[in-house]
Amino acid sequence: MRNQQFAIRPTTLDQARVELQQIHFLDDTNLSFTTPSDLLRDFYDRSWPEYTTSSVVAQQLSNLMATPETDGLTYLTTHEQVPVDVFYNLALQRLGFAVDLDFQLTDPLAAMTKIQLPVADHEGTTFTLNELMNAWYVLLTTHNKTGQTFLDQLTTHGYFAPLIHDNSVPKPLIFNGKAQAVFDTTQLIHEVVYVESPQDTDHDGHRDLLKAEIIRPAETANGLKVPVLYTASPYNQGTNDEAGEALTHNVNVPLTAKQPAATTLADVTAESVTTPLPDARPVTATTHTAAETFAREQSYTLNDYFLARGFAVVYAAGIGTKDSDGLRTTGDPEETTSTIAIIEWLAGNRTAFTTRNATQAIPAWWSNHQVAMTGRSYLGTLATAAATTGVAGLKTVISEAAISNWYDYYRDGGLVVAPGGFPGEDADVLAEETFSRQLLAGDYHRIQEKWQHQLAAITQNQDRVTGNYNRFWDARNYLKNAKNIKADLLLVHGLNDWNVKPRNVNNLWRAVRDLPVTKKLILHQGQHIYINAFRSIDYTDIVNLWLTHELLGVDNHAETLLPNVIIQDNVTPETWQAYPDWDAPSNPVQHFNLQADELVAPSDHIPAAATSFNDQLPVDQFNHYTHHIDEWQADLLGDKHNAMFKHRLLFKSAVLTDDLVLDGRPTIDLQVAVNQPLGLLSFQLVDYGDAKRLGVSPTPLRIRLDEGYRWREDNLREFTVAATTPWKMITKGHRNLQNRTNAYQVDELKPNTFYDLSVTLQPTHYRLLAGHQLGLVIYATDFGMTVRGNQDLQYSIQLGQSALHVPFITD
């Protein structure tokens, strides 16, 4: 394994001593010790909280080897000094690394270097008392074999249990700039409130009430004010999976010609809708006691981790969900309004009630008015939407795999393009799936007619006929309001996420690059996933450092300690690199011209020529591919004379003599013609060369990774190397040939006439190894994403006028 820890805060010896005292590893007793071996023995005695007798603790120490010949108990009993190699022999074993398997007792420092574990500063071959204190401090921050810090490992064994009810222990308790698990998770308070939102989306003459589920530390009952992690999840109260499936659109339909129109941006700019708002409900009584509770929430494991560390957690599903008012809208300003209403209540700026009867108001009296939003996909999307309002109280957003513009989720370049894995899904399908008011028969009976009218409007306005950008999508483009962001941002995205494609995070990153907020970006090699339980990166520690700074006001240097950009390497397993930026404007660009079957240097002479392919497949082949998209993809990128040979164009570079690190948005300039007044092109950039590549889905390494003491659990995972493959798709893109100018203007397309076309592919960061070839595949129908009409469309490309441009960086 390889360990990368970005969140270890450099700490002076004086500060380390103070913090070790605060967590009870140092006290007046062991501070009086004069020999390093006695101090280390005492540290180890304290590190087995599950054993209460000294003889059993001694036995545990005797089970560790200090040298190839001597166990830990014997060594520390018979020696005064602690050699550096003895310290790390014992430490590696306590971290779960196996002698002879993971390291050799004759050279533990070699393993520390190989695994990339931190080694404490020391001047000689043995630790002084002060150096030993510092070394133990650093060890507590070091990751074990399962990706947890040693202190988190001790936490799961009950180290902090005696401190939970110790009034002398400060709460929150901070160690190495991070909050520690000194809160009683067996006594968490669960309560429900109904926040009154400034909207009436179901038009019943009353402001919408929104259900919020709150989990807060019991210590708040005694006056402690705590920060809040808020997850806005439209799935939280249940989903209508069968109804969504029934509404899913047929994608085996032909592409149709569009009427040319010189549509302008002003024509498609969404207009603010101002409708009279019902009066707020009168507040006649206020209480601090909730009237409703709940059992088990649909939790997010990262939130669970922080519940043990003194953060409150709030879940809300928003308008149009079970036990709330309103109608679903899929990402428009009304949904943003409902999202930030919860923040406004948590910040003390909005009213909530104890029940839906709205007779008693209840403030968030336990909140310190500092809120972070967390979540992946739709959840992270709403966090992004909330941030673009600049709402007071929202200090930071941790958004994973989030949409920044809904057009980029369901459309691309004037085409209906599905999120990967969900052909036929659209905004109306998602609205129906999340309209969980439908799960309550009585409530649905009262609202059904309004909902069906709303759903029909979404279906019409999303416009699957043209695929153009319009006012519907403009209202769902959060990038327009990125300038309003005041919250600091931690953005996380998968470079192989073809559900919420990388363009979403890239566009947001570029939009906030010059804003006066702290922003960080983590890009991993996965699909549409969470990364908070990965072994090779200290993501949970990063988030802890970040939230402790953002919500607790601790000056732990998170804003400068964490790199601007962290990117997982696609070649070497368990490797993450720090970068100053992603897709920087200053990146150099490598240019390739298109020649018959080749990508060549611009200096090469290219004779004028055209090459063609036909998109129409034999019926049996077409039908087979619609049910076996993986086989279509393999044939598309595979050997030259396979089943897709006449239905796509493939260009390969010469074999690379050096690694090429792609970084940013590849672009393609073409001259293209089609034999009908309609057409589309799709593109894939490909790494050709036999290699064992990382899988895009993580491998479970261990079940039940504890997040506290006798608390909830998560599954440890990691990207592992898969079997050898001959190619790997790097990135892709699509364009309607009638949207050559932009996504809203419809251009004329005359049959058999060549037109200039420039296409920007999805952004990437990818290391292409020496000995491999860069490939470009040009095709039309994308069986996983576009409509599939199987039409007789013949496409021609002018080779002498076509080129690929690839931004790159040098290591």
Swiss-Prot record:
Keywords linked to the UniProt accession: Aminopeptidase, Cytoplasm, Hydrolase, Protease, Serine protease
Predominant cellular place of this UniProt entry's protein: cytoplasm
GO biological process: proteolysis
Catalytic residues of the enzyme: S377, D497, H528
Tree of life domain: Bacteria
GO annotation, cellular component aspect: cytoplasm
Keyword Phosphoprotein: no
Cross-referenced Pfam families: Peptidase_S15, PepX_C, PepX_N
Catalytic activity: Hydrolyzes Xaa-Pro-|- bonds to release unblocked, N-terminal dipeptides from substrates including Ala-Pro-|-p-nitroanilide and (sequentially) Tyr-Pro-|-Phe-Pro-|-Gly-Pro-|-Ile
Signal sequence region: none
Alphabetized GO MF terms: aminopeptidase activity; dipeptidyl-peptidase activity; serine-type peptidase activity
Record localization: Cytoplasm
EC annotation from Swiss-Prot or TrEMBL: 3.4.14.11
InterPro entries: AB_hydrolase_fold, Galactose-bd-like_sf, Pept_S15_Xpro, PepX_N_dom, PepX_N_dom_sf, Xaa-Pro-like_dom, Xaa-Pro_dipept_C
Subunit structure, as described in the record: Homodimer.
Protein's job: Removes N-terminal dipeptides sequentially from polypeptides having unsubstituted N-termini provided that the penultimate residue is proline.
NCBIfam families tied to this protein: PRK05371.1-2 (NF003781)
Family that this chain belongs to: Belongs to the peptidase S15 family.
Protein name in UniProt: Xaa-Pro dipeptidyl-peptidase
Source organism per UniProt: Levilactobacillus brevis (strain ATCC 367 / BCRC 12310 / CIP 105137 / JCM 1170 / LMG 11437 / NCIMB 947 / NCTC 947) (Lactobacillus brevis)
Lineage: Bacteria, Bacillati, Bacillota, Bacilli, Lactobacillales
